[in-house]
Design a protein with these regions (language model features):
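Alpha/beta enzyme core
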Residues: 32-38, 42, 99-206
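N-terminal capping/small domains of soluble enzymes
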Residues: 1-100
């Protein structure tokens, strides 16, 4: 057995410790990760809004008192560059209202990062922008995004909230569409749901 087969890897890179920093809008950026880089193996920065619809939603949410990022692709590139040379495997948590928005990001940064689709946010402006939990309720649209990113040859993660829909069905659909990672929020359901998802697909679970 090769040594690489005995250790966890994400996006083809070794994970030094199985602790991952999750995205928190307006909070988890490169500086946040650097301050904690000695203690984590991977990190997802963002969420970042990719198009007019999601940027408008983020602005509305910010005006309501939530923290949000306003970074465009150039600013995201700067964040990625700040983490060059670290041993933290990096992912971007992304919000887009169309498949094309995700593909544009993938063509900007290629396989330097993991692309995490935000199917998690339950704020109404983001749902109305056809993002976040909208994608859980409309899994055909979510799987279209996964397939498009997979076709670009990049590593695809989906951040989801357990218990919103049939988790086992969704896990199987995302696996078939080409997802590599499921990032599951168990806050509302408890840890027992993870076994159901694990038994439904062979994807890496966070």
């Amino acid at each position: 057995m090769h040594a690489s087969n005995r250790f966890l890897s994400l996006n083809g890179k070794p994970v030094k410790t199985p602790v991952v920093l999750a995205s928190m809008a307006g909070i988890t950026n490169a500086e946040y990760v650097l301050q904690r880089s000695s203690h984590v193996g991977a990190a997802f920065i963002g969420g970042y809004s990719l198009d007019d619809a999601t940027r408008s939603a983020a602005k509305e949410m910010k005006e309501a008192g939530r923290t949000e990022f306003e970074d465009d692709l150039d600013a995201i590139a700067t964040e990625i560059a700040m983490l060059d040379g670290t041993d933290v495997v990096l992912g971007l948590n992304l919000r887009g209202s169309t498949t094309d928005a995700y593909v544009a990001a993938a063509r900007e940064f290629w396989n330097s990062v993991i692309y995490e689709i935000d199917a998690h946010c339950r704020q109404q402006p983001m749902i109305e922008a056809h993002c976040g939990e909208y994608l859980l309720q409309n899994s055909d649209a979510l799987c279209d995004i996964v397939r498009a990113l997979h076709a670009e040859g990049v590593c695809v993660s989906v951040k989801m909230r357990a218990g919103v829909v049939d988790d086992r069905r969704l896990a199987r659909e995302l696996w078939a569409a080409g997802a590599d990672i499921l990032h599951v929020d168990l806050m509302d359901t408890g840890y027992t749901r993870i076994r159901q998802i694990r038994n439904s697909c062979p994807l890496i679970l966070i």
